[in-house]
From Swiss-Prot:
It catalyses: Release of the N-terminal residue from a tripeptide. Its cofactor is Zn(2+). Zn(2+) 1 binds at H82, D142, D199. The active site is at D84, E176. PROSITE patterns: ARGE_DAPE_CPG2_1, ARGE_DAPE_CPG2_2. Its EC number is 3.4.11.4. The keyword Translocase does not apply. GO terms for cellular component: cytosol. Cleaves the N-terminal amino acid of tripeptides. It is an enzyme of class 3 (hydrolase). This is Peptidase T. It is found in: Cytoplasm. InterPro entries: ArgE/DapE_CS, Bact_exopeptidase_dim_dom, Peptidase_M20, Peptidase_M20_dimer, Peptidase_M20B.
Length: 406
């Protein structure tokens, strides 16, 4: 179905810079997310007819309710999207609207080209309306496409009270891109039987498996002496960091893994001879494999310290989130409903693991099973990001179908 305000709504949202800040201790981590919630989304939610619209300063979530129009539909269902965008330039976002007929797309005057040679997924969108960047910023379809889709679906239902639907709760939250958005999620306030994050990618994505995730921060303590007299005295902290990294499996890195394969990812390394620091993320799907990865990292550090006869490798290892499959597979109702709706709409469900995490990972373990629905974004987190208007429209259709199911 075509929705008059969907594109306009999306373009309004993406032009607002809501990039999160991993170095901030505030909630949300940027004031722009608060402003977006209070000055843009909250008035709009109230205007389209949502009830009990309220902002929770304790966790940065904006929540609203659309009351049920049917006593027959007993489920209470939530839809969640995040307001922040990823760690890439989000200042002065200038979207392009392209009626795509194939070939390359020039991204404004930036000199960058969105080409099917580099991104074969473009070939799936011939004849569709694409929204791209101008090559200087990201787009923010992750996850403002989700916000626009949820808002459009709620507006449609509020303006068509004759449509039977269950009670619906909507939540727009902060800081998903830096992994802390759902840390303070208020399950009691949201109060639904199950929910969906609308934060996926291409048409048909329906996901209930995520990585289990850990962070690993290492500090290597060296001993700096003059290199001319260093024999048997110098301990080079940078070399220790390299030694640690060399003992991790070489073929278990992000660039060499896919599907259900886990990895170690070194994403930051800095230091001097005297002290060096390295930061990793550890990811895997199965609990036993996840534990093995963490144990290996700890064992390498312990063995290095034993060989050095002192604690020169200091380890901070902490869990970040877990594979929500463990929760959702106990009751597949939200998956079965979404799958049935997609099939009725001639959308092929793509049920594959998320090689990442969503807010739903944490929310599921808090007590609300929360799988992930497609929102349409492609090539997310950078200048080559784009989204199809037609895919966004179908995401709205899916939301409308879900809330009408018993």
């Amino acid at each position: 179905m075509s929705y008059e305000k969907l594109l306009e709504r999306f373009l309004t949202y993406v032009k607002i810079n809501t990039r999160s800040n991993p170095n901030s201790t505030q909630t949300p981590t940027t004031q722009s997310q608060v402003d977006f919630a209070l000055t843009v989304l909250k008035p709009e939610m109230e205007a389209i007819g949502l009830k009990d619209v309220h902002y929770l300063p304790s966790n940065g979530y904006l929540v609203g309710t659309l009351p049920a129009t049917s006593d027959r539909l007993r489920h209470k269902i939530g839809f969640i999207s995040h307001m922040d965008t990823a760690d890439f330039n989000a200042e002065n976002i200038t979207p392009q609207i392209v009626d795509y007929k194939g070939g390359d797309i020039e991204l404004g005057d930036s000199g960058y080209i969105l080409s099917p040679k580099d991104f074969p997924n473009l070939n799936n969108y011939h004849g569709q309306t694409l929204i791209t960047t101008d090559g200087k910023t990201l787009l923010g379809a992750d996850d403002k496409s989700g916000i626009a889709e949820i808002m459009t679906a709620m507006e449609y239902l509020a303006s068509h009270p004759e449509i039977e639907h269950c009670e619906i709760r909507v939540g727009f939250g902060p800081d998903e891109e830096i992994g802390i958005g759902a840390d303070k999620f208020d399950v009691k306030d949201f109060d639904v039987d199950f929910a969906y994050t609308v934060d996926g990618g291409p048409l048909g994505e329906l996901q209930y498996e995520t990585f289990s995730a850990a962070g690993l921060e290492l500090t290597f303590e060296g001993r700096n002496v003059h290199p001319g007299t260093a024999k048997n005295q110098m301990i080079n902290a940078l070399q220790l960091a390299m030694d640690f990294h060399s003992q991790l499996p070489e073929n278990e890195r992000p660039e060499q893994t896919d599907g259900y394969q886990g990895f170690y990812h070194l994403y930051d390394l800095s230091g001097t001879v005297d002290q060096a620091k390295s930061s990793y993320i550890i990811r895997d799907f199965e609990e036993v494999d996840f534990l093995k990865r963490k144990h290996l990292a700890q064992d390498i550090a312990d063995n290095m310290n034993e060989a050095l006869q002192s604690e020169r490798v200091k380890v901070k290892l902490y869990d970040q989130y877990y594979n929500m499959k463990k929760v959702i597979e106990k009751d597949m109702t939200p998956i079965n409903i979404a799958k049935e709706v997609m099939e009725e709409l001639d959308i092929k469900p793509i049920i594959e693991p998320i090689r990442g995490g969503t807010d739903g990972s944490k929310i599921s373990f808090m007590g609300i099973p929360t799988p992930n629905l497609f929102a349409g974004g492609e090539n997310m987190h950078g200048r080559f990001e784009f989204v199809s208007l037609q895919t966004m429209e179908k995401a709205v259709d899916v939301i409308l179908g879900i809330v009408a199911k018993d």
